[in-house]
Amino acid sequence: MVTARPAGRGGRGARERILTAATTLFHREGIHATGVERLTEHAHVSKRTFYQHFSSKNDLVEEYLRRIHHAGGMPSEQAIDAADASPRGRLLAIFDSAPGSRLRGCPFHNAAVEAADAMPGVEDIVHEHKLDFTARLIHTATEAGARDPYRLGNQLAVLFEGAKALATSLNDTSPLLHARSAAETLIDAATIDSGK
């Protein structure tokens, strides 16, 4: 009699299940607090299967962050690329947040804090993502007609990062509302004569 392997263990889709588990657990519990055993349990794979796909937990953390980066970042960051809004509307949309949602923070900021100096590959991905997002803000500020798009893009990046961090610390979206209001003032001042 042949016994079937338990459903959902190893085999096809194991790498994807591990990445899905990492996304859920790193977001909910943190990177350091989530061990390989917890990841394999959540992904329904053996440790052997885990190590067939990822050479280390650090390797998984890097892939987790790369995946988010290539998707355009967090949903709030993806708003900068929305095709159905004006450049001004896209710059403001990054500050929008669903009311009542549990705020866990930016995965890149969280990873940078948890990585400290222990995971240089993670630091490189975090730097790349933050610089890329700022460049996208600068590009959109140019489209919005800002006289100094570099300055406006960087100001909005700092405002966004600070508002997200405070909102996460307080588990309250009101810092994002205040930041959106401040962003409106910055955008208006930077584009007052542009007509866009």
Q: Where in this protein do the model-derived segments appear?
A:
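Short hydrophobic clusters on alpha-helical segments that form packing/core surfaces
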Residues: 18-26, 98, 137, 160
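Hydrophobic alpha-helical connector segments
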Residues: 63, 76-104, 149, 153-156
